[in-house]
Amino acid sequence: MLNEFPIFDYEDIQLIPNKCVIKSRAEADTSVTLGNHTFKLPVVPANMQTILDENVAEQLAKGGYFYIMHRFDEAGRIPFIKRMHNQGLIASISVGVKDYEYDFVRQLKTDAPEYITIDIAHGHADSVISMIQHIKKELPDTFVIAGNVGTPEAVRELENAGADATKVGIGPGKVCITKVKTGFGTGGWQLAALRWCAKAARKPIIADGGIRTHGDIAKSIRFGASMIMIGSLFAGHIESPGKTIEVDGEQFKEYYGSASQYQKGAYKNVEGKRILLPAKGHLQDTLTEMEQDLQSAISYAGGRQVADLKHVDYVIVKNSIWNGDASH
């Protein structure tokens, strides 16, 4: 039962260092394998309209990073798969669970993407289980990621249905207001929820939401994530699709949630909000900094590779120096 687990979030945890065994942090290997492919980092930009478009997806794939294209340009998905495959790049797309998506999946048989993410807010649902089974029947070689979920029961059910990985996180994101609108979610205890789910998982888990610092990537690995989905840290770059807005001479980029009125174009079942983020530099600079910080984390863990982070000790530090949403 959950009540037997300590409840904590990212800011409540500090990892405890081990003796360093590498001469330089540059020796630490940050690569991870998901399915049949290996990627430079265990992170994936959130599949949201203000985080990536086709050009950003292509840049990530060319650079050796994992990506998941969002599902909000439905007609563009098949041309996108062609565009990627024509360049020898992996195709990774998202689908929903509406009836017409079943026909869409059938259309992919001639040119199947390597990865499909079934992307709905409450992924522990019969509709998701049915879609997993459908994709596995029609496209047996495609790696299926399903989510989002927040309990071990959900992880087990989706894995048993055929999901190759599950995405854990209900509403902990910076522009997600599910917890406020519904009273449900993993906001405020996302890291404990990840740990709880990972103990039940037999397949990879993607931690999704609540990442505020690069150190949170190492903490996610420690508590069972194979890959970490990140929104706000990847938003606001020069290449990001969000609109650039000037306020008092300063440049900002918009960032909004996938169930916000800005994304939906209508105020109905809204569980996301819009914020403005100070415009950042290039996406590659952030990826490089994440890699260097993760290499440092691996060296503090006394390790040589990402998996070595899974074995470090930790302490729970309540009332820590940050508070979840405070600006760091």
From Swiss-Prot:
Family membership: Belongs to the IMPDH/GMPR family. GuaC type 2 subfamily.
Name of the protein this chain belongs to: GMP reductase
Domain of life of the source: Bacteria
Keyword entries, A-Z: NADP, Oxidoreductase
UniProt-listed SMART domains: IMPDH
GO MF annotations in UniProt: GMP reductase activity
Phylogenetic lineage: Bacteria, Bacillati, Bacillota, Bacilli, Lactobacillales
Catalytic activity: IMP + NH4(+) + NADP(+) = GMP + NADPH + 2 H(+)
Entry-linked PROSITE patterns: IMP_DH_GMP_RED (PS00487)
Source organism of this protein record: Streptococcus pneumoniae (strain ATCC 700669 / Spain 23F-1)
